[in-house]
């Protein structure tokens, strides 16, 4: 029983404006849709159901029925989902605009209530006020919203969401924004609406209103790699392939600074209809490059590391070792399809082996060493505290020598030409024979930053940018990277 969906279905018959604004895929004929993956609330129709991915942002936030309209909360076109989406910072004036929009689209008055009651009573056995027949009249106006933080912006998608107690497998979390408004004013609005309902329906309306307006907000969730779909990637077998997104736009291109004003468009019905008549779609191909995806990839590598290689005498690089039970790595994982990760893994292991061999550690593949525990963490460059600790453990294991208050280790073992070049790049064109802890960190970070410079990466993929941001980046030709040409960050 999705109250918001039912309200849209019945209220869209009132007038021309409502028929345009309240048209939901969930109320239309079902069309073939992508398979669902997560349980949660569809942002478009607010029902709790199985969700599929959005073609505008790659997040799972739309049901199979609503997916046919390709609406995203980051769109530019002021459809109902976009008008219910607000960005920080929300003012009392912004909330007034939202409440006014609700009053325009979902009015409750004596004439309208009688019209709905008469419509229900036309059918036999419907003289009672059963809740399922009048569900559309039982949607209170609340400041209940689902929230998500993307980069530096926090988005709030207002609506009436049933079944709040159910399991939520999406990164969106419930928040109560009643504190941004006057509690008594909101109560008064709803009591005035409730007065026009029969007594039995008044009781249910009041119960729903207080349950959805007095709840405690939940803590915000952190995004992870699995929150984004791979279905929008051009070539899922290519790690550098672009993500295809579609955004709904309008010809006037409103500024992002006026994001929270979208809900005011419905005040002037004629102007709103003209705006919607100018709508069109824009298609963008964006890079997968971001910290979230990078952290996920390095997390996999840290679990596949074969630290025994740093004591070995294999002539081949770390990933090309065969017929050695201690050093041979499983190269069938999808992560190794990325040539950048291959280079990083080989070069990091080559450099660490050079340090170990240079400082008198005579071991072999099969030896069990305490230093092995820290090697996987050296690939977790996105977790700097953990990474620094791992490098320090490695450095101390090499038994550094104190020279004038600074500890040094040797570097006189042969490294491959690529590592040599990266050492020279980070050490002002020289290959030093001794290294302190800062030099060691600098070289190891340079090897990784050569392809994944996380210092200058976005936290989330560009699919979470607003339409205006995508348009601006596209004009600067900054939506894609040059990894397909095997050009590194440095190059």
Curated annotation (Swiss-Prot):
Interacts (via C-terminus) with host IRF3; this interaction leads to IRF3 degradation. Interacts with host IRF7; this interaction leads to IRF7 degradation. Interacts with host CUL1 and CUL3. One of its GO terms (molecular function) is metal ion binding. It comes from the Viruses. A motif (pLxIS motif) lies at residues 485-488. Residues 42-79 are annotated as: Zinc-binding domain. Plays a role in the inhibition of host innate immunity by inducing the degradation of key host factors required to activate interferon production such as IRF3, IRF5 or IRF7. Associates with components of cullin RING ligases (CRLs) including CUL1 or CUL3, which are essential multisubunit ubiquitination complexes, to modulate their activities. This is Non-structural protein 1. Residues 1-81 are annotated as: RNA-binding.
């Amino acid at each position: 029983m999705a109250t918001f969906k039912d309200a849209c279905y019945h209220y869209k018959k009132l007038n021309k404006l409502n028929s345009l604004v309240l048209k939901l895929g969930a109320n239309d004929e079902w069309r073939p849709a992508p398979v669902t993956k997560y349980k949660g609330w569809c942002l478009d129709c607010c029902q709790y159901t199985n969700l599929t991915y959005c073609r505008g942002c790659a997040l799972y936030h739309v049901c199979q029925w609503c997916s046919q309209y390709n609406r995203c909360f980051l769109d530019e076109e002021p459809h109902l989902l976009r008008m219910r989406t607000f960005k920080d910072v929300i003012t009392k004036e912004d909330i007034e605009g939202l409440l006014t929009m609700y009053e325009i689209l979902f009015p409750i008055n004596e004439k309208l209530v009688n019209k709905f009651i008469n419509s229900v009573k036309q059918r036999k056995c419907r003289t009672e006020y059963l809740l399922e027949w009048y569900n559309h009249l039982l949607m209170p106006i609340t400041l209940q919203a689902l929230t998500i933080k993307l980069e530096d912006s926090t988005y709030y998608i207002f609506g009436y969401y049933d079944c709040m107690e159910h399991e939520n497998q999406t990164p969106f979390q419930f928040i109560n924004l009643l504190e941004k408004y006057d509690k008594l004013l909101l109560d008064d609005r709803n009591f005035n609406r409730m007065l026009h309902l029969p007594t039995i329906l008044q009781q249910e309306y009041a119960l729903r209103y207080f349950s959805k307006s007095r709840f405690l907000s939940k803590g915000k969730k952190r995004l992870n790699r699995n929150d984004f779909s791979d279905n929008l990637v051009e070539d899922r077998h290519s790690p550098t392939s672009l993500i295809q997104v579609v955004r709904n736009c309008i010809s006037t291109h409103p500024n992002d600074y006026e994001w929270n004003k979208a809900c005011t468009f419905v005040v002037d019905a004629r102007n709103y209809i003209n705006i919607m008549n100018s709508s069109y779609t824009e298609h963008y191909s964006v890079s997968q490059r971001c910290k979230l995806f990078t952290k996920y990839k390095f997390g996999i590598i840290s679990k596949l590391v074969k630290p025994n290689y740093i004591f070995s005498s294999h002539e081949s690089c770390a990933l090309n070792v065969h017929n050695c039970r201690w050093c041979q790595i499983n190269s069938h994982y999808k992560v190794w399809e990325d040539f950048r990760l291959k280079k990083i893994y080989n070069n990091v292991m080559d450099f660490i082996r050079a340090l170990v061999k240079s400082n008198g550690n005579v071991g072999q593949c099969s030896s069990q060493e305490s230093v092995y525990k820290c090697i996987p963490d050296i690939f977790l460059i996105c977790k700097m505290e953990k990474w620094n600790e791992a490098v320090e453990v490695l450095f101390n294991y090499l038994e550094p020598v104190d020279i004038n208050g600074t500890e040094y280790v040797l570097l006189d073992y042969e490294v491959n030409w690529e590592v040599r070049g990266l050492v020279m790049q980070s050490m002002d064109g020289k290959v030093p024979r001794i290294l302190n802890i800062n030099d060691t960190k600098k070289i190891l970070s340079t090897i990784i930053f050569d392809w994944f410079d996380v210092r200058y990466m976005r936290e989330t993929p560009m699919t979470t940018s607003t339409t205006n941001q995508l348009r601006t980046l596209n004009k600067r030709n900054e939506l894609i990277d040059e990894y397909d040409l095997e050009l590194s960050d440095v190059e």
